[in-house]
């Protein structure tokens, strides 16, 4: 029989209609001689009623044999429920069954197919095809499809060209570790799976495509966390002849359309812009969450004369004020915050409480001489908690930024209904890597330096600024972009600043440098992390919830057991030898 419609779409206007439905048994109940079945499909749940007085003995026997997750086909007449179920979109109707057949049976599932299950993550991933049957998971992927549909429509209307770039590319330094693919034809040589289509999309601009986009899989072999996966999807854009402001305008329009199409929300344009230095100094993060206050405050000048060497001898002293919540933090609670501070490189965490117009706490005795100045500088009020970090500027900012976010979550200070977009601009071109002992690209080595600071490529790299911009949503980096270098001499200077010899630059990027001999236009673009964007729209805190078949925190797939060992024959064909491994 042909399916008439989805079970989840049956409504009161279908009363009296004969229909055929197909789906899974969610639940079976026997009440007063009648059998009630919740039939579930992609669109929702529909109640079926089997009355022994209205069906054949064989249909009744089949109904009695049904168990959860059996796949069935059922025909009958839509009728009004005696008592509506307001919790279901189909709650006003039910199907009086006339015909019923089993299309497939099912073993008992390792967890119930319903929202709010308590199964651990690896069990959910081991049986991902069952996990994806749950309504909330299906909704996540409907949302994802709406997002990509909205993006494609928007960019197509702006005459962007959707172009596929290679999955097998050249391994290049400056970034996360590559996933390498050995070549059988070219023995001893390796492809890399792309961390992004960065260079190829730039070459498309040199080819005259003018406006390119792609919704593309990318790969990075890096340590995993809640908003990272080894393979991920990004919305990749590149344009020619546009300014950074014009590119940002296009991206803002795209996001506004997605928010309207998927959430029914109008977002205010243009998005706020914040300089990188302001973000770090005021929020302790280059991806600040602006849904709550508790900004970092610099007290270096206020405390420099106190008789407390931790403060007076520190490079900077900064603080955050937790307003009207001092009573929520015992000494034990503050000790936990101190341990977190140490994880970010701080030597410790000083603190005060303010009540009855006076300060108290372990360091209060050192600050009595400046109590009035401190109270005024921090605008202290009754029941405030003050947390101090005295260290380098970088450590103070990062530590207090992390504490700010943690405390806001603990105290439920965040309005989760808000979607606060903003641009972070005026980026440094380079950042110092303690691990590498050198400056590295803050974004990538193809970012255009500002005209005012480009001369420092041969001088103080800390002073070079980039024509770069990150878009941030609710404390997450949603995406990043920049204008690109299109002049060969500037690109060669950039490589030299990063420590490349002329020979190594030619070996790694010779094809790009050669392309710059042939009229490379001014260009720039941006990439947005699609998984992260959908995660935030869906109100989730892990991108695994919006990726159909993700990896776990060990970069493994519990369902397929990937990665796995391969046969000796496969290794021999590739001239590879595995020296050692652990099962």
UniProtKB/Swiss-Prot annotation:
Keywords: Aminoacyl-tRNA synthetase, ATP-binding, Cytoplasm, Ligase, Nucleotide-binding, Protein biosynthesis
Disulfide bridge map: none
Major enzyme class: ligase
Record's keyword annotation contains ATP-binding: yes
Residue intervals passing through the bilayer: none
Entry's localization field: Cytoplasm
Residues the record lists as binding L-aspartate: 174, 220, 443, 484
Binding positions for ATP per the UniProt entry: 220-222, 229, 477, 529-532
Gene Ontology CC: cytoplasm
Coiled coil regions, renumbered to chain: none
Catalytic activity, reaction form: tRNA(Asp) + L-aspartate + ATP = L-aspartyl-tRNA(Asp) + AMP + diphosphate
Top-rank taxon, per record: Bacteria
Family: Belongs to the class-II aminoacyl-tRNA synthetase family. Type 1 subfamily.
HAMAP family tied to this protein: Asp_tRNA_synth_type1
Record protein name field: Aspartate--tRNA ligase
Organism name: Streptococcus agalactiae serotype Ia (strain ATCC 27591 / A909 / CDC SS700)
């Amino acid at each position: 029989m042909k399916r008439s419609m989805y079970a989840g779409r049956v409504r009161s206007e279908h009363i009296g209609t004969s229909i055929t439905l197909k789906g899974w048994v969610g639940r079976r109940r026997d009440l007063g001689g009648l059998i009630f079945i919740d039939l579930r499909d992609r669109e929702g749940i529909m109640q079926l009623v089997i009355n022994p007085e209205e069906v054949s003995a064989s249909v009744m026997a089949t109904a009695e044999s049904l168990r959860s997750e059996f796949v069935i086909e059922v025909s009958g007449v839509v009728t009004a429920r005696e008592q509506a179920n307001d919790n279901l979109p189909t709650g006003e109707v039910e199907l009086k069954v006339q015909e019923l057949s089993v299309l497939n049976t099912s073993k008992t599932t390792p967890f119930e197919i319903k929202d709010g299950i308590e199964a651990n993550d690896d069990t959910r991933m081991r049986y991902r095809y069952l996990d994806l049957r749950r309504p909330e998971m299906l909704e996540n992927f409907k949302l994802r499809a709406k997002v990509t549909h909205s993006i494609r429509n928007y960019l197509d209307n702006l005459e962007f060209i959707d172009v596929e770039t290679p999955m097998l590319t050249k391994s290049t330094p400056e970034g996360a570790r590559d996933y390498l693919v050995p070549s059988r034809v070219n023995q001893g040589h390796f492809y890399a799976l792309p961390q992004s289509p960065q260079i190829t999309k730039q070459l498309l601009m040199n080819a005259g495509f003018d406006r390119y986009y792609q919704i593309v899989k990318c790969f990075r072999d890096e340590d995993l966390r809640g908003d990272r996966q080894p393979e991920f999807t990004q919305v990749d854009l590149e344009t020619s002849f546009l300014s950074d402001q014009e590119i940002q305008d296009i991206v803002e329009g795209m996001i506004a359309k997605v928010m309207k199409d998927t959430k029914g929300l109008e977002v205010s344009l243009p998005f706020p812009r914040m300089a990188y230095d302001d973000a770090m100094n005021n929020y302790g993060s280059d991806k600040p969450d602006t849904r709550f206050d508790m900004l970092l405050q610099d007290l270096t000048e206020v405390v420099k004369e106190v008789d407390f060497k931790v403060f007076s001898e520190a490079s900077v002293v900064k603080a955050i004020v937790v307003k009207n919540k001092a009573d929520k933090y015992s000494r034990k609670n503050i000790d936990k915050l101190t341990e977190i501070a140490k994880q970010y490189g701080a030597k410790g965490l000083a603190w005060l409480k303010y009540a009855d117009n006076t300060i108290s706490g372990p360091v209060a005795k050192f600050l009595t001489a400046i109590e009035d100045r401190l109270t005024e500088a921090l605008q202290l009020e009754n029941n405030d908690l003050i947390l101090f970090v005295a260290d380098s500027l970088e450590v103070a900012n990062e530590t207090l930024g992390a504490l700010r976010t943690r405390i806001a979550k603990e105290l439920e200070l965040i309005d989760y209904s808000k979607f606060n977009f903003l641009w972070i601009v005026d980026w440094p071109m380079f950042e110092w890597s303690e691990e590498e002992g050198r400056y590295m690209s803050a974004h990538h080595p193809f970012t255009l330096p500002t005209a005012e600071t480009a001369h420092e490529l041969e001088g103080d790299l800390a002073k070079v600024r980039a024509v770069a911009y990150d878009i941030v949503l609710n404390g997450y980096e949603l995406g990043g972009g920049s204008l690109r270098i299109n002049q060969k001499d500037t690109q060669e200077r950039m490589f030299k600043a990063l420590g490349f010899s002329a020979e190594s630059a030619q070996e790694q990027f010779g094809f790009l440098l050669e392309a710059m001999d042939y009229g490379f236009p001014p260009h720039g673009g941006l990439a947005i992390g699609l998984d992260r964007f959908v995660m935030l729209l869906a109100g989730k805190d892990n991108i695994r919830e919006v990726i159909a078949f993700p990896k776990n925190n060990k970069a493994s797939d519990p369902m397929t057991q990937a990665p796995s060992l391969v046969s000796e024959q496969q290794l021999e064909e590739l001239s590879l030898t595995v020296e050692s491994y652990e099962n």
